[in-house]
Amino acid sequence: NVDSLYPIILRFPYPKAGTTNSAVKVGYVAASGGETTWIDLPGDPRQNYIMRMDFIPESNDLFIQQMNRPQNTNKVWIATIGGGAPKNILTETDAAWVETNYQVTWLKNNTYFTWQSERSGWRHLYRVSRDGKDVQPITKGEFDFIEQVGMDVKKGLVYFIASPDNYTQWYLYSAELLGKGEVKRLSPMDEQGQHRYDLSPDGKYAEHTFSNSVTPPRIEMVALPSHKTVSVIENNEEAASQYQQLQLSPKEFVKTRSGDLQLDAWMIKPVNFDPSKKYPVIIDVYGEPAGSTVQDVWQGGDLRHQYLANQGYIVVSIENRGAAAQTGREWTK
């Protein structure tokens, strides 16, 4: 739509319930232009999604993730440009649903790639051969691999976020790409809350941000894997001081039960709370997948919730099943 002087708007209506699904196909065209060549992926193009499509580095091969309509099967295909039929090298299935892999990294001259899976009951990182025949765990244990921060290929390390003991708090860990040894926590033990990292390309340094529900973000540059502070970018001391002066009601992290299921929650009580009295309760609900409301992270001091508590309400949020709570497949699904 950019061949002419002015671009042409193309409209694609989203299919409504009961109407025919849109057909999704994968094709390629030369950078210099020409005809589109379509890749013959098995399956009805109206009954499958193309979730991801990336070139494998230093090759003419496409790495394609194809998911069925119920979203409980993710098939990985490798298709060579001009090289015949695509090959299904890996299939991920689950009785409930599967996730798309957004952080595939290629290793060992592009002969292996990283893959996140819940096949063990917990979300972990795996090392998979290019033909899909060799699948080996990089991380192991009863915790969820939350996200990959980066790698130091020379040292053979992957840096990732996990929360083995308390999913409301996030910490940085490292593991050997060969899957040997134990995972190591790198975030400081005395900073309880959530740690976020932006890793340098060589994996030697990271911009580190720490916060929790009562601590505004503190940002620094650290060296890895020692986690030694190189420089402080922003400590937010003034914001922290002003917040403390407000003398707000504390945000309490608690656990409750729904039958046999244990649920995490937080609660903010009115100032001068009297346990002998009854109070109206407001429950803050999200209730959809891929989100989480019970997190020990700075959220602007929860001023909206604090205002409601100041008006005499108890404010509560309870994590529901299906949320991104990083507590294993059985609880989530």
Named regions from a protein language model:
Residues 1, 59, 187-188, 194-333:
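Serine-hydrolase catalytic core recognition
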